Amino acid sequence: MKIEKSQRNLEIDRSRKNDFLYPLIFREYIYTFAHDRDLNRSILLENVSYDNKYSLLIVKRLITRMYQQNHLIISANDSNQNTFFRYNKNLYFQMISEGFAVIVEIPFSLRLVSSLERSEIVKSHNLRSIHSIFPFLEGKFPHLNYLSEGLIPYPIHLEKLVQILRYWVKDPSSLHLLRLFLHEYWNLNSLIIPKKSISFFVKKNQRFFLFLYNSHVYEYESVFFFLCKQSFHFRLTFYQVFLERIDFYGKIEHFVEVFTKDWGDSLCLLKDPFIHYIRYQGKSIFVSKDTPLLMKKWKYYLVNLCQCHFDVCFQPQKIHINPFSLYKHSFALLGYLSSSSVRLNLSVVRSQMLENAFLMDNIMNKLDTTVSIIPLIGSLAKMKFCNAVGHPISKPTWADFSDSDIIDRFVRICRNLSHYYSGSSRKKSLYRIKYILRLSCVKTLARKHKSTVRIFLKRLGSELLEEFFTEEEQIIFLIFPRASSISQKLYRGRVWYLDIICINELSNHE
């Protein structure tokens, strides 16, 4: 009975189907919405959208050409003779892919809304703040023993991406259109997707690629963690019977033969694995307090699961297992890339149950971060805000915007940096970064008005950039009144600002 219930939980929830996504491709407002949404989410990345090309006139022409096609869904061999792709192919593909990314997210949005209405937020696995890593570091970080990390491979064949979406999107026309796009831009004769094609596709269609990539990775991650969680409930069940009764994939013979020989007949070895998982920068990172033997078995388990069921070519020799003590003093995650940027300090929390009662001191770990100056300067240099040594330069690609738009873009970057490092205790490096952005903004405005920085500031005054100095107003503090009749002092402490939508280059810096 318990196994049948687990099997039902493993099945993907298909209660929210949408069979009418394809007609939305011919709606103008979808492309406008996709463009505006992409523009608002751009922070540090150069806006490669359609500031100079995008217009509703182009969209109308695009939709008209799509309507005029008698056979839009064709094979890749006939695409060279198709006038739809021969005319300005890159622009049309980029526009449709962004619109398609918005359309295909509709079933996921409906599932999310329904989950929130039923107050079943636990079932929405994607509702995780990037700052959930900090409580993990404070509570679990000092007690872990081993870390395993490896690159997450791309699917062997493009058709696997389409097959994954078939579970969520029940619209054959949309899936055929997706297949046409993929076959048009990638080489079908290659078993593994070329890295150059991936890089080009990611740069031109970030939203579209991230959606496909996350959908693909989420599938085998969900199965793997389901089995990890269920291992606690099947300790007395024979492993071979356990796999056969769940029957989560067809190629089970080799899998069972390997694991009955290598793991034994029961799940007693899976007792309390304490496995923590992070997916970051295309890597899968496992951290555990188990022995190296169990870590190797979990690694082998994941590799066979992905290769047999999802046709993902994992290379076990590239998944390294090292003592976690090597990483405790050199932690690189979420933009904190310096070896000294993450520190665990002991702090004393004093609590009082009742007024005039005795005080209790509890010692706990406190995560303290410092702003890493070198990676941040590298990110700003990559985005052409400064040179390699941190000297501010103008942003010529923004010189065509209005003055208010230029200032708003720079202020938005500074505000997000302040929010991201709001919980840091040492911010001298952050002040230097904000100085680089302020001076880069002034040089960009001076370049636009064909003037020097000194003359421009003298003419307009320093009030033009006063928004850069409002950092303290953007930082949230928690203020607690002290429950005492003698003193009514207020205690103020640092907290992490959690309203982070997109950090882009900060959290993806290599």
From Swiss-Prot:
Regions crossing the membrane: none
GO molecular function: RNA binding
Record family assignment: Belongs to the intron maturase 2 family. MatK subfamily.
Cited Pfam families: Intron_maturas2, MatK_N
S-S pairs: none
Any one biological process term the GO annotation gives: mRNA processing
Task of the protein: Usually encoded in the trnK tRNA gene intron. Probably assists in splicing its own and other chloroplast group II introns.
Entries under PANTHER family matching the protein: MATURASE K
Keywords: Chloroplast, mRNA processing, Plastid, RNA-binding, tRNA processing
Organism of derivation: Populus nigra
Primary subcellular site in the record, as a coarse category: plastid
The name this protein goes by in its record: Maturase K
Cellular localisation: Plastid, Chloroplast
Keyword RNA-binding belongs to the record: yes
